[in-house]
Amino acid sequence: MDADVNLKTLPYRKCVGIVVFNHEGKVWVGRRLMTLAHADIDRSHRWQLPQGGIDEDEKPLDAAYRELYEETGIRSVKLIKEAQNWFYYDFPQELVACTLSNKYCGQMQKWFAFQFTGELSEIVINPPPDGNKAEFDQWKWIDLESLPSIAVSFKKHVYMKVVSEFRGSLRSL
């Protein structure tokens, strides 16, 4: 890690996280593409939910719709619920030097749950629509409760909160 980076002085990056339920109550997850920053991560723990930064002057819900489309091609969704609180996680020290140009110590995320109302053919990840950069090389539907077990270690506690926050959302599907 860059010796000049003091994690305690870096802010959290504002972003959104997105849970997409299908008609069976399963959750969409994508497997992150391998990068140098993720070289040490076991392939079985590279699965994650769509997420991304909130642009300046952008509302979190608008960012959620935008990020979901940019990463997955999905537009056909119905909002189910917005998490009441922001969830935080810290980047591991070894990732800070190569993640977002040493500008952030981690992420603060506003989470949203949506119901997918489209056709599977709408889901396009590699390459995603409109020239967006691919983030995933595979995707699948899984049980909500399985999220923490497939996540990278530094996101597990956030995924446990996501499960707790949206567990009741299954009843509204």
From Swiss-Prot:
Domain Nudix hydrolase intervals: 11-164
Cofactors required: a divalent metal cation
EC code: 3.6.1.-
Gene3D superfamilies associated with the record: Nucleoside Triphosphate Pyrophosphohydrolase
Motif interval(s): Nudix box: 52-73
GO biological process: nucleoside phosphate metabolic process; ribose phosphate metabolic process
One function term, GO molecular function aspect: bis(5'-adenosyl)-pentaphosphatase activity
Pfam families xref list: NUDIX
Keyword Iron: no
UniProt entry keywords in alphabetical sequence: Hydrolase
Described purpose of this protein according to its UniProt entry: Accelerates the degradation of transcripts by removing pyrophosphate from the 5'-end of triphosphorylated RNA, leading to a more labile monophosphorylated state that can stimulate subsequent ribonuclease cleavage.
Family, as annotated: Belongs to the Nudix hydrolase family. RppH subfamily.
Protein name according to UniProt: RNA pyrophosphohydrolase
Gene: rppH
